[in-house]
Structure formats: structure tokens, C-alpha cells
């Protein structure tokens, strides 16, 4: 099942469309449940635990039959994966948390493409999101002394013509922080 987070739906709908097109171009059977809403993270972050719990239950009911739940958002995928079970508190099964993945994680670890039908003759910079790095393990965090890896760059290297340049501080916080950037733009 394809989960399009509320902020993607409202602010960046082209990302949802591009995710759908990418997955189907790889021959995957993609379903977009029309009754999806949100993962509940904005409500949980604002302290509305009951509302977040109700949303997580709806999410689980909507996506539990799928083999995978794929989202173009590391933050939302991480929230479903790690926080939905906490919200459930044993009151419902929370079947989706183990099968929810960010689109990069899904492509890199499950689909494992060896080529992409894409040509992009441009220089791109890759900034790794905090949730992607530290919760989902999409790349190695710079503050830890571990072997370097980057699943995003591994996938981008499959695109013909692309040149990848990482910024000097490639995984330092960008300030977005989900709703924090909307509610506190000057601090963010």
C-alpha cells in the first residue's frame, strides 16, 4: 500500500505522484487506499495522544492487509514503525508497524533494483533527514564511528547522467522538524 503523508498531500503532491510512478515503473502493484489520512505524528507531537491513537488505529485498519506500506517520508514511516506500537499499548495488534518503510528503504532493501530507466544530467546534493539517518538507518550518522553507507546515494547512482555532491555537513539538522518548522519558522 502506498501511504502519502498529510504534509506531502497538502504541500508537495507531486512527490506522491512521483512515488507512485516510480514504484509502478519498477513493475510493482501499487494500491493507494483512498480513506487514508495521516500517521498521527502531528497530533502526538502536539500532545493529543488520544487523537493520535485513534488515527494510528485507523491507519492500521486501512493498511494491515498489505505486504508493505511505503511512504515518501522518513519521518512518517519512522513514526508508524516506532510510535504506533507505543500508542496501541496492547489495545490493538498494530500490524502495520513492522511492514512500513520509507520509499528509499523499500527500494534499497526489498526491491533492490540494479538499474533505473532514468536520465538526469544534473548535479544534485543529498541532505539526509534526521529521521532517515537516525531512526531508519538510511545512511550512517556522521557522529558515530561506523563504516560509511548511504542508501539514498546507492539508488541515485543508478540514474544515468547524475552527479552527486554531498554537502560538508551532510546530516546536520536542516531545521524542518515536521510541524516545528511550520509553528516556529524563525527558530527552525
Regions found by a protein language model. Name each.
Residues 1-188:
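Iron-sulfur cluster-binding electron-transfer modules in prokaryotic oxidoreductases
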Amino acid at each position: 500500500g502506498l501511504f502519502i503523508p498529510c504534509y506531502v498531500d497538502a504541500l508537495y503532491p507531486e512527490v506522491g505522484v512521483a512515488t507512485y510512478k516510480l514504484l509502478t515503473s519498477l513493475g510493482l502493484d501499487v494500491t493507494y487506499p483512498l480513506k487514508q489520512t495521516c500517521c498521527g505524528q502531528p497530533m502526538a507531537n502536539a500532545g493529543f495522544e488520544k487523537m493520535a491513537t485513534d488515527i494510528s488505529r485507523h491507519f492500521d485498519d486501512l493498511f494491515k492487509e498489505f505486504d508493505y506500506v511505503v511512504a515518501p517520508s522518513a519521518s512518517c514511516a519512522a513514526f508508524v514503525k516506532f510510535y504506533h506500537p507505543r500508542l496501541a499499548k496492547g489495545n490493538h495488534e498494530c500490524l502495520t508497524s513492522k511492514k512500513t518503510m520509507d520509499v528509499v528503504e523499500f527500494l534499497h532493501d526489498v526491491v533492490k533494483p540494479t538499474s533505473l530507466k532514468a536520465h538526469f544530467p544534473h548535479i544534485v546534493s543529498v541532505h539526509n533527514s534526521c529521521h532517515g539517518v537516525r531512526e531508519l538507518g538510511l545512511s550512517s550518522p556522521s557522529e558515530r564511528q561506523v563504516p560509511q553507507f548511504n542508501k539514498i546515494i546507492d539508488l541515485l547512482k543508478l540514474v544515468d547522467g547524475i552527479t552527486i555532491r554531498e554537502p560538508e555537513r551532510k546530516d546536520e539538522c536542516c531545521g524542518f522538524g515536521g510541524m516545528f518548522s511550520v509553528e516556529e519558522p524563525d527558530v527552525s
